[in-house]
């Protein structure tokens, strides 16, 4: 068997600070919801968000230890306040080839509407555990039994 690689962390990037990565400025955003410690990188110059597991085409897991729908909603509101209609969300978990999975502002708007309707009880999900809520044609939100 091959030895496991060791990845050393030299520095933790502080939240809400800009990091220069080879002449490109990225702001580190705390993005709880999927997990308590989720983060997103924001490139204001290119109007891009690197969202990781916070939002992507496919099933969003919001039933993990540390997942929180209130946090998901609040982070989604903050992201919508930050970006414009031209912004691109570069996400994780490519389900369709080729290229990086991309979403747009309207996908965050759809997620926010879904979260609000789950909270108010007007959006009905399918299943018991996880409960699946249709966000749009590309995204489902999977939650535990209660908000």
Language-model-derived ranges and their functions:
Residues 4-81:
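Catalytic core of the metallo-beta-lactamase
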Residues 77-147:
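Accessory terminal helices/loops
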């Amino acid at each position: 068997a091959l030895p496991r690689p060791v990845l050393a962390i030299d520095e933790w990037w502080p939240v809400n600070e800009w990091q220069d990565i080879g002449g490109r400025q990225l702001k580190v955003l705390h993005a709880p919801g999927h997990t308590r410690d989720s983060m997103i990188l924001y490139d204001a110059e290119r109007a891009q968000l690197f969202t990781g597991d916070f939002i992507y085409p496919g099933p969003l897991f919001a039933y993990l230890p540390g997942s929180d729908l209130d946090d998901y909603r609040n982070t989604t509101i903050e992201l919508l306040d930050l970006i414009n209609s031209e912004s691109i969300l570069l996400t994780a978990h490519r389900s369709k080839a080729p290229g990086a999975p991309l979403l747009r502002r309207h996908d965050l708007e759809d997620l926010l509407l879904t979260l609000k309707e789950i909270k108010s009880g007007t959006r009905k999900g399918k299943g018991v555990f996880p409960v699946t809520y249709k966000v749009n044609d590309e995204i489902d939100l999977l939650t535990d039994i209660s908000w």
